[in-house]
């Protein structure tokens, strides 16, 4: 998830010609990866892996003394996380909290089933490389579709369907599923007081998350 409401409007037209799957390879992605790797992950760390919803959170401040590293990159998708997870795995952190898939479902035509396969690949890399790391699967968050009905209409239904797949996958793998969706949603939508643009969170939204 990237930027402001203006950015979302700019991308609405592009949604008419969406790709089958999403990749995220631009200067911002690569510069963020480069800067993040200046601070290597260690066995004492808890890692927050995700997109802009994760990136915008002040996790180290929220959980002082827990050695939390923010590895969110705005705009990132599951394939992008696959491409950058190895340095995290190599550090064998205590725990990894994953929030991903929203950009894939918003900005590509990928099916829920194919996206789940990508998610499984991400988890396989983590499980093989650092089997003792605790992995937490966080649900997708609801949207406030009224902010951009032309672009977001019907997306909450897809998000809810994908969350059900994530929950089942977590149970099958013996991982913890964190249902943030249910804590935040009101009548299936992200409440206005939690969001600036229908996607990204205000402080009140992060207060619910943590």
What name fits each language-model region?
Residues 1-8:
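Short, small-residue-biased leader/transition segments that mark boundaries at the very start
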Residues 9-95:
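Serine-esterase "nucleophile elbow" of acetyl-processing enzymes
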Residues 26-42, 55, 87, 91-92, ...:
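Extracellular glycan-modifying ectodomains
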Residues 46-48, 69-72, 95-100, 134-139, ...:
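Structural recognition of the beta-strand scaffold that forms the well-ordered cores
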Residues 70-73, 102-115, 149-155:
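Surface-exposed cleft-lining segments at the edges of enzyme active sites
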Residues 72-76, 97-108, 140, 185:
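Cell-envelope and extracellular/periplasmic
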Residues 112-121, 156-162:
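Charged helix-capping and loop-helix junction motifs
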Residues 142-210:
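Catalytic His-Asp segment of secreted/periplasmic serine-dependent ester chemistry enzymes
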